[in-house]
Amino acid sequence: MTKEPASDLFARRFNDAGFAVLAFDHRHFGESGGTPRQVVRFGEQRADWQAAIDFAAGLPDVGPGGISLWGFSLAGGHVLRVAADNPGLASVIAQSPVVDGRALAPNALRAMTPLALLRLTGRAVADALGSLLGRPPLLIPTAGVRGAVASLTTPDAMDGDRALDPDHRYTDWEQTVAARIALQMGGYRPGLHASRIRCPLLMVVCDQDRSTLPGPSVAAARRAPASEVLHLEGRHYAPFLEAHEEAVEAEIAFLRKHLVRADVVREGRGRR
């Protein structure tokens, strides 16, 4: 899993249930290297997931079929594509995932004022052109209220602070992204690869999600050969808020069905 704030809420519970957890930051973000900072490149981020899989596969306590992926929002979309390319995975959990940028675009546009859309487009184009000239990224907030120039201004976009960092523990958390992402999201459709996912898939869908929408996630899950859909009441960040206990308990139960725990691997080796 990635190390965005509040993912530790799930990581601790998974670890308490007997599962080892490997968490990392995508390049250009958090504690990972890479410049310029705060730049999202979908292919590079998927390559980071692949590197994490390759690293985990070489650890002594990871047996065959001992790797599961967990991703939220954009990372939730990444894990679908990565799982499609890695048929040997044990399972994958996609929580409130970005499944189909084309399907999400009209909803995101409706959440913006015309002036905000114009300003965002101008900033995104300027950022993309500037990158060709080696200029620093033009950053925008990852979330904002309607009328703001931000990556997302849907009604539940601003729930992120309350959900992910309510106590302001993550003082170094950068809530910005290079504006060029606004030109890229509509073409990012990782859910189209769901039919190639051979491992069990748990799709966690928030029924009132106004950011990634439940419909595309359910449709992608139906295309996957071995999928389950967990419906939660609430908006995009509900798995970190009012639906947290329901989400984490269901995810642990799913992992227990499909993923060999680290302590079981150690015990099995001790009996040889």
Predicted regions located by residue number:
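Catalytic histidine-centered segment of alpha/beta-hydrolase-like enzymes
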Residues: 234-248
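Alpha/beta-hydrolase fold nucleophile elbow
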Residues: 60-73
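Conserved alpha/beta-hydrolase
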Residues: 11-34
